[in-house]
Amino acid sequence: MDTAGMEHSVSWISSNSDELILRSWISSRMDIAELHRAGDDIKEMMKSEGYYSEPSKYEAELSDGNITFAYSYPIKAFEKFLGYYDRENRIAFNPSISMRTDFSFCLAACRYRKNGKTDTVVLDGYADNKYYKKAKFALDKFRSEYSINGSFDFYIKRYRRYQKAKGLSESSAVAAAVSRALISNVFGDDAAKDDIFVSRYARLVSGSGTRAAHDGISMWLSYPGMDSRDCVAFKVGKSNENLNYGVFPKYSDVATDNAHSIAVNSVFYGTWVSEKFSNVKRLISDHFDINDLLKIGENDMLRLNSILMSGGLIIQTPDSLRILKEILKFKSKNEGFYFTADTGPSIAIFSFDRSLIDEFRENVNDEYIEGSYDFKGYNNRMRDFIREAQEYFTQTPGEDEEDRL
């Protein structure tokens, strides 16, 4: 085991006694060295099965005032993650797996300013302090890695098929879209088409964004002590278009960042994480069997909620619990019907038998968004978005907007 690498990965917390105490407490209940070995084993299995490829390298080609555009769709997780082993480098404790969904999408524009001193972020028409902080964190690390001077402006817009919801991974789409727009701006089109390379930097904005850089089914390779440059996502399967899916969008005001910190304090966290490595090894051997993924998605949703409840955080609502009760009752009489949810009360359902979904919906009158595999809807919005972004950049030619955030 590369202990030097592991020492480097935790060096960022040396000045923060609370983080150091938490890390020590977690390590006392989890075999970090064993998780590292299991992660290395998974990496080798990915190589052997042809899923893994070394991230490519690109040279920066910056042009002052250059504007680039990108899009992304969100994901729905089967093998989930909560909690970072290395928050500074956004390295999770375990690998995670998801599929792309079309419940929303995100468009992003990125402008480079050679002499700029302050990055700016406008999300859905407003200067957004939360995403500004996330962007600044990611951009500072990005600029340091490639010795880039200057600043970047982002104009971002989300397009939803619902009014308001939590747990539909909008942040993953934002992270992947802004990362691809940035990569396109700095390295050009070839780099922007490299989903693995894009996923490396989407990770710095949002962990789930790593997987949103890919279409189909993807896995984020992450584990304690790994080289942060290898902490990327890989496509492990195409979308199974025979699988019907949809979601009941529900809203809550639970902050995901809060869920991350609560999860790692749970007495059940170590067991939950260790089980994931066994699941991923089996999935690789079985070529990511979709039926296994669907079952894992169900079980992992229940475990995730148990872990958060053990820390006093309840992410479900009366509405989502009512739907979940109906789902469990329906499942007891119907095989081939699956469900899952991420860090929020929006519950997704799946089945290869369309009639099962139709039958279930007859007894549940809540708003329902039917999923599809048509990921070209962004094209209908891109022209107007490009015009809006260009108008915005023209109106804000590069003044320091820090005071507005």
Swiss-Prot record:
One of its GO terms (biological process) is isopentenyl diphosphate biosynthetic process, mevalonate pathway. Its EC number is 4.1.1.110. It holds the Pfam family MVD-like_N. Pathway: Isoprenoid biosynthesis; isopentenyl diphosphate biosynthesis via mevalonate pathway. InterPro entries: GHMP_kinase_C_sf, Mev_decarb, MVD-like_N, MVD_Decarboxylase, Ribosomal_Su5_D2-typ_SF, Ribsml_uS5_D2-typ_fold_subgr. It comes from the Archaea. Belongs to the mevalonate 3,5-bisphosphate decarboxylase family. This is Mevalonate 3,5-bisphosphate decarboxylase. It comes from Thermoplasma acidophilum (strain ATCC 25905 / DSM 1728 / JCM 9062 / NBRC 15155 / AMRC-C165).
